[in-house]
């Protein structure tokens, strides 16, 4: 029996018991690094949206989105406990490390999921709550349980889950979905493949050991490198769309263009990387830059908004 077929067996033998997990262990179950990116992009969507929202309601909205993202992470770790135990990158996560039992993680994730969606609906609006519920479902069921272990396109399709937060933040203010919020979605959606395939290149051994069909393992390094360049180009183009569509300034557009060129440059370095190169430094550099890129793009959008709607409205001169 393979690890994938046996994922339910992890930690399920013997008499049911409770773990002695600490608050820190449960916090790690929420994938705080991923949550920080989710919270930041959701906050950007909330701020950039036209209209006003009560600061307290806005805080509740961001908190609910953060809790929903954490719930998704907990459910992902519950389902993936079998492969997490084998992969070097994930072996120290709370479940494979024996700090939290799988059934505890499942209950924790389901409880937080329901709480975040219900409170967001009651306190903000039900469209935002529905989008949050769909995001959790998409990440846990569509990506984690289905796509991740069945197709090398897992990241391409599954990346939608990570792209919804700014759209949810936008819906919290406006109660709707617009072209602008779809553009914010697309920036993250198109960014995701290059980001994760860079990781998959230098973690091929881990993914191969557990049978997860990542692009490099199934289609080879050469195909993966070409696909990374394609998605880097698409990401760079999506990054300047806010200016092209008129909801960001030329200053932002110039900054996004420079960032996009950097993304493309790093992707081309990966393309030129010899297959015999076991260190894969270009892939590691692209992975690191891609994280900085996304934070920089959404930070620039926020700064651009503040200049246009706060400082200039107050009588500043640019």
Curated annotation (Swiss-Prot):
Pathway: Porphyrin-containing compound metabolism; heme O biosynthesis; heme O from protoheme: step 1/1. The chain crosses the membrane at residues 34-54, 55-75, 95-115, 118-138, 155-175, 182-202, 228-250, 254-273, 287-307. It is found in: Cell inner membrane. Gene3D superfamilies: UbiA prenyltransferase. GO terms for biological process: heme O biosynthetic process. It is a multi-pass membrane protein. Signal peptide: none annotated. It comes from the Bacteria. One of its GO terms (cellular component) is plasma membrane. GO terms for molecular function: protoheme IX farnesyltransferase activity. Keywords: Cell inner membrane, Cell membrane, Heme biosynthesis, Membrane, Transferase, Transmembrane, Transmembrane helix. Its EC number is 2.5.1.141. It catalyses: heme b + (2E,6E)-farnesyl diphosphate + H2O = Fe(II)-heme o + diphosphate. Its main location: membrane. Carbon 2 of the heme B porphyrin ring is defined according to the Fischer nomenclature. Converts heme B (protoheme IX) to heme O by substitution of the vinyl group on carbon 2 of heme B porphyrin ring with a hydroxyethyl farnesyl side group. Belongs to the UbiA prenyltransferase family. Protoheme IX farnesyltransferase subfamily. This is Protoheme IX farnesyltransferase. It comes from Sinorhizobium fredii (strain NBRC 101917 / NGR234).
């Amino acid at each position: 029996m393979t690890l994938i077929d046996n994922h339910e067996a992890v930690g399920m033998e013997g008499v049911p018991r409770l773990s002695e997990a600490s608050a820190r262990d449960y916090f790690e179950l929420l994938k705080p690094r991923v949550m920080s990116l989710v919270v930041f992009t959701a906050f950007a969507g909330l701020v950039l949206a036209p209209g006003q929202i009560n600061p307290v309601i806005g805080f509740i909205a961001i908190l609910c989105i953060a809790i929903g993202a954490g719930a998704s992470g907990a459910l992902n770790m519950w389902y993936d406990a079998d492969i997490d135990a084998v992969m070097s990158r994930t072996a120290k996560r709370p479940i494979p490390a024996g700090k939290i039992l799988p059934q505890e993680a499942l209950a924790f994730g389901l409880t937080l999921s329901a709480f975040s969606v219900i409170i967001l609906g009651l306190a903000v609006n039900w469209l935002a709550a529905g989008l949050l519920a769909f995001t959790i479902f998409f990440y846990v069921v569509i990506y984690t349980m289905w796509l991740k272990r069945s197709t090398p396109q897992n990241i391409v399709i599954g990346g939608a889950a990570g792209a919804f937060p700014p759209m949810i933040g936008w819906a919290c203010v406006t109660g709707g979905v617009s072209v602008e919020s779809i553009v914010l979605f697309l920036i993250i959606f198109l960014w995701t493949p290059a980001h994760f395939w860079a990781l998959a290149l230098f973690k091929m051994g881990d993914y191969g050991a557990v049978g997860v069909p990542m692009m490099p393992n199934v289609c080879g390094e050469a195909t993966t490198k070409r696909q990374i360049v394609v998605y880097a180009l698409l990401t760079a183009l999506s990054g300047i769309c806010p200016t092209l569509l008129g909801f960001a300034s030329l200053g932002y557009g110039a900054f996004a263009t420079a960032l996009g060129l950097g993304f493309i440059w790093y992707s081309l370095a990966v393309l030129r990387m010899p297959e015999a190169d076991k260190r894969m430094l270009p892939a590691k550099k692209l992975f690191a830059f891609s994280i900085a890129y996304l934070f920089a793009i959404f930070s620039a959008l926020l700064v651009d908004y503040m200049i246009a709607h706060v400082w200039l409205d107050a009588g500043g001169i640019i």
